[in-house]
Each structure stands twice: as C-alpha cells, then as structure tokens.
C-alpha cells in the first residue's frame, strides 16, 4: 500500500494543512518509492533480499537497519489470465474533475494494457447498483472504453450493494488458477445502503478465501474515508492507492498496479532474530497493523499479506548497539537469569515464509545479516 504518501502530499501541497497523525503511516511512505534491491536468484526462489545499515539521522549512537525485499518479476508469458470487475462509484460526490473524470481516463490506461484473453466487467453504484458492461474480452478495448466514457455521476452512495454485485460477477466468471480481482474506485463516501464495517469486511474475507481479491483506488479530496478503505483492502488480501492527479494516475496504472495485480506469493511473513552480542534493543518502524505474534510465523493457518509481481517491500528497524548507545528504557538486570550470547559478527538472522498463490504449505528462506552491511555514508536511496 502506498496511499498514505500521496494523500499526505495532497494535504501539504494543495490544501496547505498538516496531515492528522493517523494519516501518516510510515510503511506506506517508504514503500511509495522504488529502490535498487537484489533480484531473486535460483537459490532464493521468488524473493531477493537486501540489507543495509547506517547511522540513525535522529540519534547518531543508534543505527537504522533497512531490509529490502524484491519480488520476482513475472514475464508476460507467465502472467495468468485475468478476470477483472471494475466497481466504480458514480454517486454525486464523484462529479468533481479530480474524481470520476480522472477515474475514467485512468482506467483507460489499464484497459490498454489488457491481454486479449483477459476479461473485464463494469459494475457501477450510486442510489442503485447496475452492470454497465457484461464480461468482455480484453481484445475488445474499444467496447470497454466506450462503456467507461458513458459513465456519469449522480445520486447517493450504496457502496455495500455495489461490492456484493461485483463479487457475484467475479465468481460467476472465475478463472481457475487465474487472477480474479475486484477493482473498486471511489472517494470512499459510503453513506447509503449496507455500510456496516463488520458486514463488509466479512463479505470481502469470504471471497478472498475463494481467491477473489480486492484492489481499491481512492480518488479526489474532501470526504475520502481513508481508514475505512485501508481496512477493506487489508481484508481482501489487496492493496490500495490514492490518486489525486493525472501524474499519479499514470504512475499507479503503469507501475504500481501492473505488478501488484498479479500475485506471486501469498501469506508472506518475515521474522528477524537479533544477536544480543550485537544488538541491545530494537524497534520496528511502522507496520503497526501488520505485526504478528512470534508463534504465528510458522503457523500456516495464520493469514498474512500477499506480494505481487515485481513488488518491493521495505522495512526499517532502529537498533541500539550492544556496545553502547542511548536508551530511555532504564531497567534492572535480571537477578535469576543470565543470558549467554554467542559472539560473532552476525547482527541478525532473517527469515521469510510464503506460500505459492495456489498452495497451502509455506516455503522458507533464511539469510544471515552480517556486520559488513554497515555503511557509514548512507546510500542515496
């Protein structure tokens, strides 16, 4: 997810206001950008991993460890057939130029990248829900674009009804082993119809378990319900983007979406064990809603996030070195326990587990983080 960055940029640059605290999600800020990470090799399978450590910019005694994960980039002949349902909000609140008009031009970029055998359906919702384009092959681009051009804004927003119909249509046209996905585009103002968060989340989760995933695109300004959109996309094993101008739309539809729409691994989890001989204290920066208990790492029944083709994940840890460094946590030494540490140049051991998109058992890769990842001159990215 990268919505937080573009949403904050809009608040600062257009509205000239400071964003509220909850709008600043660190992991979405750092994952907005692309980095030069190691690509997967034959031994690593679907993921390449990069490590770099430098001095903390806010406390020179502490260190920042960056973990960069690079997903496999699927070639065109490896990408599965896609079954997309565009679920488009055409309520009155979408009439602004940076909402429905921008949405229509943005979706045309996705349509132009469709493969001939892909399927596209379009469901719209406002006061009523309707199917404006029955399942259509990707080779019929003019027909799909014509349906988009005819969309007009008006009425209130029955978002819950629209989601139900979109999922039903996706299931009716399910491609076994394919990429089945609802792409919801809205300003987030679900104010009429079935709007219970719990009911919507249960609905989305039930279809996720049938391998129908959800991507959400937020358009425009003002009444965009960012927290609700985030929860819904998380429940749908999906991702979401915030689009506020044509430049951002081009970036999302030609870079962000093209990779994340094709899942290469599901239930992706990482776990890192720090060497007490090297690290006295540590903290994960961001990802408050993504953290798992230690025992969940090897539990294949525990749900986690998916990773798409070419997708990158960036994780930062702040570290207090064992040989010194500032700490506000003043605690007494243990009286009855003595921790014996293994002296080595290891900083940590990194583990990553994932399942194949159609698999039930996890694969695991292990990497050792050595002290030579320290770079006194932090890299420019």
Predicted regions: what is each one?
Residues 1-11, 16-23, 37-52, 57-65, ...:
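An acidic, Ser/Thr-enriched
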Residues 25, 158, 196, 378-381:
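Secondary-structure junction/capping motif
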Residues 27-37:
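Short, structured protein-protein interaction patches enriched in aromatics and acidic/basic residues
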Residues 43, 47-268, 288, 295, ...:
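Exposed acidic/Ser/Thr-rich ligand/metal-binding surfaces
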